[in-house]
From Swiss-Prot:
Expression sites (tissue/organ): Highly expressed in kidney and at lower levels in stomach and liver. More specifically found in the epithelia of proximal tubules of the kidney, of the bile duct, of the gastric mucosa, and in hepatocytes.
Keywords of the record: Cytoplasm, Lysosome, Mitochondrion, Transferase
Binding site for substrate: R107, T108, H109
InterPro entries: P-loop_NTPase, Sulfotransferase_dom
Classification via SUPFAM superfamilies: P-loop containing nucleoside triphosphate hydrolases (SSF52540)
Active-site residue list: H109 (proton acceptor)
Task performed by this protein: Sulfotransferase that utilizes 3'-phospho-5'-adenylyl sulfate (PAPS) to catalyze the sulfate conjugation of phenolic compounds. Does not transfer sulfate to steroids, dopamine, acetaminophen, or alpha-naphthol. Except in mitochondria, where it can add sulfate to cholesterol producing cholesterol sulfate, which alters mitochondrial membrane organization, and impacts protein complex mobility increasing state-III respiration, thereby modulating mitochondrial respiration.
PANTHER family on file: SULFOTRANSFERASE SULT
Name under which the protein is recorded: Sulfotransferase 1C2A
GO cellular component terms attached to this protein's record: cytoplasm; lysosome; mitochondrion
Enzyme Commission code(s) on record: 2.8.2.1
Location, primary (coarse class): cytoplasm
Family named by the database record: Belongs to the sulfotransferase 1 family.
Amino acid sequence: MALAPELSRQTKLKEVAGIPLMDPTVNNWSQIQTFKAKPDDLLICTYPKSGTTWIQEIVNMIEQNGDVEKCQRTIIQHRHPVIEWARPPQPSGVDKANAMPAPRILRTHLPPQLLPPSFWTNNCKYLYVARNAKDCMVSYYHFYRMCQVLPNPGTWNEYFETFINGKVSWGSWFDHVKGWWEIRDRYQILFLFYEDMKRDPKREIQKVMQFMGKNLDEEVVDKIVLETSFEKMKDNPLTNFSTIPKTIMDQSISPFMRKGIVGDWKNHFTVAQNERFDEIYEQKMDGTSLNFCMEL
């Protein structure tokens, strides 16, 4: 059976203020920009493939006080809608958010300058997770390969150029992380690093818990550490996206939850690519106090 046009690999990216986004998102831009945030909204913000599902499950378990049964009420992508998601005729992310009771936990991959203005005027809380650029690039490549609603990434070498030029969906990694980092002290933003979460998950989970205004017993925190481990989540059909149709995510090409490690970039970057990337990285990150761990 032929795929519907919107599900084919011919999906195009269109730009909004210089940021490439998926065509249906751009077509729904007016609804996204007029979204009405609420003061008690918590927005999970990430560049793609930076630990979004992981932090989402952590937040979910904290919200439910570590109650595993309550956390299993539905698949993870239905719990916290992505504000900019649009894939007609399905309900948009805005539609889903509008139907949720307060307090809401929502998600976005948007850079700060494209966020609906009501988030800023309502002084919402933002939970940002950043992942080092090299691992992020590799993970996003494999996601691009399996995600049938994104353009074909081509070869690794071709995709390498696309990524460093910021021509992937949701734009430049460099601009994204710098944009959120630069405003972290002006708004209620908890800025976390994927690598810190791998190194000491309990410590980082406790930061999130405090940010959410929760005070859970240590044994509950230990339970959350266990339940949100990569191994547990990879085997959990409620978190591993295995319920998504193959016409959207073909996990026979690459699993949604692939490795979840720090330093996998070394299995992909050539010596020449690594040297070139380091030069570009130094130029683009010049002047920022952001520091990333590239391997543990």
